[in-house]
Every structure is written in structure tokens, then in C-alpha cells.
Amino acid sequence: MRIGVPKEIKVLENRVGLTPESVREIVAHGHDVVVERDAGQGIGMSDDDYRRAGASVLATAADVFDAAEMIVKVKEPQSSERRMLKPGQVLFTYLHLAPDPEQASELIEGGAICIAYETVTSATGGLPLLAPMSEVAGRMAVQAAAHYLEKAHGGKGILLGGVPGVDPGKVVVLGGGVVGTHAIHIALGMGAEVWVLDRNVDVLRRLWTQFGRPLNTVFSTRDAIERHVATADVVIGGVLVPGAEAPKLVTRDMIASMQPGSVVVDVAIDQGGCFETSHPTTHAEPTYVVDGVVHYCVANMPGGVPRTSTFALNNATLPYVLALATKGWKAALTGDVHLRNGLNVAAGKVTHRAVATALKCKYVPAEAFLAS
């Protein structure tokens, strides 16, 4: 199979779909790889690095899309990229379709085979291709919050970890999954007072065992969210319903109850966000203020540390890329229920139930599509 890697064009997105190291593995398995010129520049990889790994370097994204049977990206295809996709061409990337009907509509009309990293599952019930970026985003969320708590950036002027004789900041983490776990790790490491809210008591037990008494665990209810948000210096939203829009856990009234200069970081913004006041921002303009509260809602947070993120992502995606290329997409999906769960849109049909529900589209089970 010929695999194409275009340069990412989302605002300040410097990750790349495949590293030279991954390219070398793919080529060793008998496949061809074409890479757009300067695609790896943001992670410090030159065109010559890709050539040495066995890839061909093409001048434009159009050349890559035209040549490839499968496109491997990082972020959802932008409008110009969607127009270059061909019927039957495989797209393997993050899609986050639930809150993005425009993208979904164009992918449905285009007829491509669209496999989303974020809904591929594992035998243990995890999301193996979302997890590495959730790890990065959870850690970055605390770093960003600490930065924007500084007075010069609109915050309260609080040092998150405090100093001897002065209280630390209070960090409230909504959701104890991968994002939440890594946010807790960094926040505790910085010396903050940390509270985590989750509706799964087993998750709270796991976190209690992992982090011990410095972490405060709370069963999540509306009352608990209201109470802890109102007294928080930082709230980090890390909730997820795979494929679906994120639930709006924090209302406008809750935001208004926070002290001016507090910071909220919505890591769930890719799936629509879990704060009622959230809307997507970019690394170029990462924040805005509502009711005196600083909102950080960058939709591609890991793109801010592209080298770390790209290598972490490739560690997870490479086996799936090889499976799709070696077996062909149809056989690979038919033989692996977990990879099949990544199929969101195929030849004009919506094949993921949560995505179809969010978009109010007809749902065609992936199994039925593959059997047709």
C-alpha cells in the first residue's frame, strides 16, 4: 500500500502523522510512503531524514493526497484537505466528529473510509490511540493553568504550589481518566491542593491507591461540582464519552461563582467541551475571559509540544497503520473489533453509534457495512 503523510495545517499544529522511524518500519514491511515537503519540520525532522528512512518527498499536499491509498495525519482534515480526499481512500487520524457537523457532512459526501484514532478501543476497555495525547494534555493542562494564574496573564497572582507559610492553589479535576490522572500527577508534584471528582467509585479508589492522602477524592454530583468549582483556583475538565459530545458539567452560573482571575482548562474541547462557557481556541490566541474567569480551551493542546506528542502518538499508531496497510483496510477492520470501533464514516455512511447519535444521522453498524 502507498501511505501519504501531509503537513499538518491547523493553526500552530506542528505534529506529523509519521516519524522517520515509523516510515522505516513501514517500508521494511514492503509498503511505500510519500511525505509532503517540510512535514516533519515542526518536530526537528528534515526531508532528508524521511528520504533516508525510505520515503519519497512530494512538493504539495495535493501531490500526497493524489498518490496515496491511505492518508495518515494527526488532526482532523481541514476544509482544503477534505476536498482532496477521494472516494474509497483511507483516512487515519483524529476526527472528533460529534461537535463538528460541517466536517462530518463533507466526509460523508466525500466517500472516504474515515478511521478515527479516538474511538479505536482495546481489550481492556481503553482507548489506546487517544491515551498518549490525553497523557500529554493532562500534564500540559496544569502547566497552562499555572501560567495563566500569574497576574500578568489575567490570573489571581497565585503560585500554584504556594510557599512555606502561604496556602497553595486549589486544583479541581473533573474526571479521573487518563487526562485526570496525569493532571493530578503534575498538580500534586507542583504542591497544589488537589481534588478529583468522578462518578465511578472504582476510579476514585484507584486514584486514592495511586496517589495517597495528598489527593482528595469526591463522588461527582451537581452539588459537589458546584461546591468545589466555586472555591477552586483552577478547574481542569477531562471528561469523555467516546465518540460523543462531552457532557456540560460546569454551568455558566458555576463559572460566575468563581473568583475573578481563576482559570479553567477544558481538555474536552475537542469533543465540544465540558464547560457551558467553552469554545475552541488556538495556540495563537489560547485564552478568553468570561465573568472574570480565564478560559484555556485550545483544541490541539499536545500540538504545543509536537516532538514529544508525535513520538508518543507513533508508538501507539504504528501497529494499526501496519495492519491496515498489510491486510488492507477491509480485512484489517473485519478481523479486529477494536480497530473496527475506529470506523466513523465509510463510503457515505456513519458507522459509529455515538457519532451518529450526536449528528442525528442514520447509523449503519460497521459490521453491516463491511459485510455489504
Predicted stretch roles:
Residues 2, 8, 79-170, 298-300:
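Glycine/serine-rich phosphate-binding loop and adjoining beta1-alpha1 elements at the start
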Residues 2-106, 110:
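An N-terminal-biased, well-structured beta-alpha scaffold segment characteristic
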Residues 5, 34-37, 57-59, 65, ...:
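General beta-strand structural signal in soluble alpha/beta enzymes
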Residues 69, 75-76, 95-96, 221, ...:
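Short glycine-/small-residue-rich Rossmann-like dinucleotide-binding loops
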Residues 209-291:
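Rossmann-like adenosine-cofactor binding region
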Residues 6-45, 152-237, 287:
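Glycine-rich phosphate/diphosphate-binding loop of Rossmann-like nucleotide-binding domains
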Residues 118-159, 269, 274-372:
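Adenosine-phosphate binding glycine-rich loop
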